[in-house]
Amino acid sequence: MNNNIINLIAAIILSLSIIFGWQYFVVKPEQKKQQQQIAVQKAENLKKQQLKALVEPATGIVVQEESQVQRIKIESESLTGSISLKGLRFDDLILKKYKQDLSKNSPEVRLFSPANTENAYFAEVGLVSNLSSVKLPNNDTIWNSDSEILSPEKPVHLFWVNEDGVKFLVTITVDENYLFTIEQTIVNNSDKELPVQSYGLINRKYIAVEKAVNILHQGPIGCIDENLKEYSYDDIKDKKSEKFAASKVDWIGITDKYWLSSLIPDKSSNYSSNFNYALKQGIERYQVDFISPVQIIKPGKNFSIKSRIFAGAKKVDLLDKYEKQYDIKLFDRAIDFGWFYIITKPVFYAMNFFYGYVGNFGVSILIVTVIIKLLMFTLANKSYRSMKKMKNLQPEIDRIKNLYSDDKARLNQEIMALYKKEKVNPVAGCLPILVQIPVFFSIYKVLYVTIEMRQAPFYGWIKDLSAPDPTTIFNLFGLLPFAPPSFLMIGAWPILMAITMFLQQKMSPEPADPMQAQVMKFMPLIFLFMFSSFPVGLLIYWSWNNILSIIQQYYINKFN
């Protein structure tokens, strides 16, 4: 086989291996600070006890008791649910715009659930103190509210007064999307100084996540000291805890493929933050939390602090908006755009732009593919000419190989001299393929991780561009009443991709090496089985790209 082709195939395989394996096998070095503020250090042990008490419901509590607690109803265009007035916990949240699946009666996606339910998942913000004598609101406190409904048009005002006359006020607002703003105010009407710390936490009962493809992060995540921190559930389980002392915390949270819950603390100070794992009574729990330095509130003085909770769908434009509006560093990285971020995000923007005009992401993929093809036309033309020259030079190359078969150095020297004389670049034919690799993976990432592509239909039987083609040739595309095993789910679009790939090969210059020609003949069949389980949107892109390549090849053949 021609050495250049062998090297090309090896390079492509190596590239695929690196791209898929990088995020799974490479552990990013995490730098830890060694110093911590003295006030925070003194409060650390008590803080642990208080936060622990907050996240562990007492044994014996049942769901019926939880339902008896008064709640504030959440009602907006994007959300429905409620906030518990006991402990001021965000533990009941449903995303109104998203269904769990494509079935007719599918329920809406539930994000938060109370602590004593099967899929416990909730968020809190509050106050703790390094003095046990200070009476602060805790997880048993029943707050008073001026309203029963929280909506974008109507904030909710809460209050509670301790036995010393210290007043605690909380104002909660929600926007039309997924962002809650919580402002806590302490009015110290006592004759004592009050040392307090603000905290926030997100606690979740572990649910097994999708592990079919190791190019997607799910689990604890955050931006600390302007660096993205990502830990898988297994990472935190092994370490039990990952701590960051006195750091700039832009946001921390827990991310799924499409959903995010995140704490966004006030920017007025640094915070200690933790990613934790605990196993209690056979239940695995994960928690992310932050706590501020000690703030001393003098008698007769007030203190206010504002924090935010994001809980909802990871829409690209929405995260971009919040990142800019509230200066939340790297908030868009909650969407795992991956290694080719600088390409993947522009590809998404292009698709989303055309979607605004055509109203179908499948059609948008077709348009973006045409644009990419036009941008690469000159490169493809040069590549084709180089391949033709290489084929014409093959007899001369074979003659040189026979002549200098015992002298490798002279052989390479003579071949390079021939290339120079004929003005041929031996790798020029590889460039279009190599350039398309990042484009291919960028489109794959867009289809796989963006909420905009979730359950986005095309035409005909394609109801979800982010899922594999649901048909298979082995039951005649649904005409026969049985479901083949998953490895035989080879649908119409994978078959179309393989056919167009075969036709494209027929249009291209035939390899001079017989062995190489045989290998290339089997490539469509190999790719048919390899990519049948990939998102159908990717196969639409590839099939359309092949069709455009055939048209392009016809044009080049005719006019060159």
From Swiss-Prot:
Subcellular location: Cell inner membrane
A biological process term (GO) from this entry: protein transport
Predominant localisation class: membrane
Keyword Transmembrane applies: yes
Annotated GO CC locations: plasma membrane
Key words, A-Z: Cell inner membrane, Cell membrane, Chaperone, Membrane, Protein transport, Transmembrane, Transmembrane helix, Transport
GO terms of molecular function: membrane insertase activity
Transmembrane domains' residue ranges: 5-25, 334-354, 357-377, 431-451, 476-496, 522-542
Recorded topology in the membrane: Multi-pass membrane protein
Function (record text): Required for the insertion and/or proper folding and/or complex formation of integral membrane proteins into the membrane. Involved in integration of membrane proteins that insert both dependently and independently of the Sec translocase complex, as well as at least some lipoproteins. Aids folding of multispanning membrane proteins.
HAMAP family: YidC_type1 (MF_01810)
Quaternary context: Interacts with the Sec translocase complex via SecD. Specifically interacts with transmembrane segments of nascent integral membrane proteins during membrane integration.
PANTHER family, sorted: CYTOCHROME C OXIDASE ASSEMBLY PROTEIN COX18, MITOCHONDRIAL, OXA1
Family: Belongs to the OXA1/ALB3/YidC family. Type 1 subfamily.
Record-given protein name: Membrane protein insertase YidC
Organism whose genome encodes this protein: Rickettsia rickettsii (strain Sheila Smith)
Lineage start: Bacteria, Pseudomonadati, Pseudomonadota, Alphaproteobacteria, Rickettsiales
